[in-house]
């Protein structure tokens, strides 16, 4: 009798992406936004098989896209046996319910997807509590469309963390859990605040930037330690702090979660304690991926997030990373314009901005000595101001 073998591998979920091109958005921007959403889906562990877009003044109140476009999506999802549809925006509870009723597959919005990735990345008790709190706050207004009890975990993307709840009877359970998590995080915050006070005398430098720009690689290079660095969105979730010494001047360098366009407000709120490393830093090192076609949009996103957490007025060193991957043909102001070279951008940026900036490649070790010298000079200014009698160090 022949022995039968069964494939026990978990089937990779297949996803369709949906985006709306609103007034003021270009086709190129919409394409870039969906590419980022595809990267998010890949980071979560699924495969994107098709994208749908529609030009609208604003998303449809009932179904996000128009009824005709929704029919197109439904036909494709049914014919290709798609597992889930992901929308590049936050859906209202009613939109989510209406779309689910129409498509009869798993529906995720951008916020749910990002929260799910955070749930998969969280390692420490603090990060896990922060993510769970954000997920429950996202879940609470959406209780009426959920079908699984809170304690019954359902697998797959969008289902990690606290799971899903059945109906209003679970509202009290979720509210109690939210209260418990807030108390737990307050206790962790007090411990973290004590730790920060203990190291307050040292100059503190925080790496900030859009997700996947190379912050952790720079952290490893400067601190000569191994911090997890990967070509995935949100590879770093928990804050890492290392002591660094350049030319006899010591300082603390922290690497924390990367920012992203449309970062869920639940996450910004719940991660405020983690972002205290940024808020309380003396100097911010803003890392930019200059090889990215829309790096200037990413700069704007980071600046808006810094403003939201109360850190916009900090001293900033801008580090344009990945110069080895810069391609002039991807950077032009208008369709017919000449491509912008790296030299052109350096000249224009330096002319417009007074804050210090430098262009490097962390992976290829290009211009690293100048980068270290720039950090040294900026840290020395703060250090000298704090310790005026330490001048013999220099």
Q: Where does each model-flagged region fall?
A:
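Conserved Switch II/interswitch segment of TRAFAC-class P-loop GTPases
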Residues: 22-26, 56-63, 90-93, 261, ...
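Switch II of P-loop NTPase G domains
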Residues: 2-7, 30-35, 58-75, 238-239, ...
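Conserved catalytic network of the ASCE P-loop NTPase/AAA+ motor domain
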Residues: 9-10, 77-79, 100, 243-247, ...
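Short, acidic/turn-prone active-site loops that include or flank metal/cofactor-
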Residues: 111-115, 233-234, 363
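N-terminal accessory targeting/assembly segments
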Residues: 1-110, 114
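C-terminal-of-GTPase-core extension/linker across diverse P-loop GTPases
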Residues: 1-17, 38, 137, 141-213, ...
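Switch I (effector-binding) loop of TRAFAC-class P-loop GTPase G-domains
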Residues: 1-3, 189-190, 196-200, 221-252, ...
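Short alpha-helix plus adjacent loop in nuclease-associated cores
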Residues: 112-131
